[in-house]
């Protein structure tokens, strides 16, 4: 073998070795050999070494080292830039991905141009850094360059930019520009609506997806079940249940099973929720939280506390903050005052979880339901952190129930300080206070507060209800006169009222 061929064989072996590095120690050793053999100036070889950083479990710790290797390259190519942007997207400094992209496009070399991979990794970095405005500029770039229509990963990334920024109207426009959206893109759009509490719109996307012949995956049905839970669409939830049973996803995917439990619990079928839960072959902390949340909604405090014992004994799962919140809520709805207080006091020692505002809100609510308003105020004043609006709101609700003007005024004052600028919350607090005044015949103060509401230009958000008929969820808003069959509706209500009065 000649000296030249031997030399090239050594280079080839070192480059292959760099691709097998799984620890930073191996990367450093290979880097040292690169320097010894003069490979550290070879762009191709260094690009392979940089790729090894993507396999490290603690990338953040070694990000500076990767950056220094990049800086040592005299003429980086597009693959090196792509790798560094990708490293940034997986680190705790995703914003630096934009820096490397700008270096790339400013490069004088004509052959260095961003590819579809560049934009894919850059969008991931922007999403992680919450650089949504930058993401929208990238959207313009990929449309102009023709990348948007040619690459599915870029399409999904751009769609996620608008979904994560909660610009759902724009997200829908982007989605409609995609020639043949796959199930992943349908999932992203549907999940965007559901995460914003727009369950009805999410279900419409799910139906449209089925009509277009797209086969749902596990994520699709999990999101759709969450939407059913939001709007009380029991009939549609049952249809999805039958669908996942045929697919055997309840046994294979714990999140599908958990979503079913949550859907039935929130749609008023706690017995069915329990039945589904008990048949789950795999359960996680979210499964238990869904069941306990269902028990809490029905005030089944004893059953909720029993779950707290079962979760560790049966599945070896340590309860988290959400599970304990569910148990506290169940205690509040069931009137289990001592059990709730004991749990709050022992949360840190027993479960290693420091109580948060929501846990204190539950206990304040529990004390108020029991008529212990002074004890509730004492607890608030002894909180280790400054009470948030949820805590004072719980006290205010108790003051209205028990007609306590003094504490009601205190709660409202704190709420107005905390919610300054939040029109809806300000209005809610002031309405509560005026109702307390009315309840104790202090009408002048009540009218004064109502005057403050009008003066601030606060308008009460009308109440609404959801009703599912034949799989269609309809929203009824208080005082709405826009329905085309309004006359028939009012006529029927009048007839029903007459019949009811005759029966009574």
Swiss-Prot record:
Name the segments for region: Type E(+) motif.
471-501
Q: Where is this region: Type E motif?
A: 391-470
Which keywords does this Swiss-Prot/TrEMBL entry list?
Repeat
Q: Gene3D superfamilies under this entry? A: Tetratricopeptide repeat domain
What are the PPR repeat spans here? Answer: 77-107, 115-149, 151-181, 182-216, 217-251, 253-287, 288-319, 320-350, 356-390
What is an annotated GO biological process for this record, any one? RNA modification
Molecular function (GO) terms for this protein are: RNA binding
Q: Which family does it belong to?
A: Belongs to the PPR family. PCMP-E subfamily.
The name on file for this protein is Pentatricopeptide repeat-containing protein At3g28660
Organism listed in the record:
Arabidopsis thaliana
**What gene is this protein a product of?**
PCMP-E80
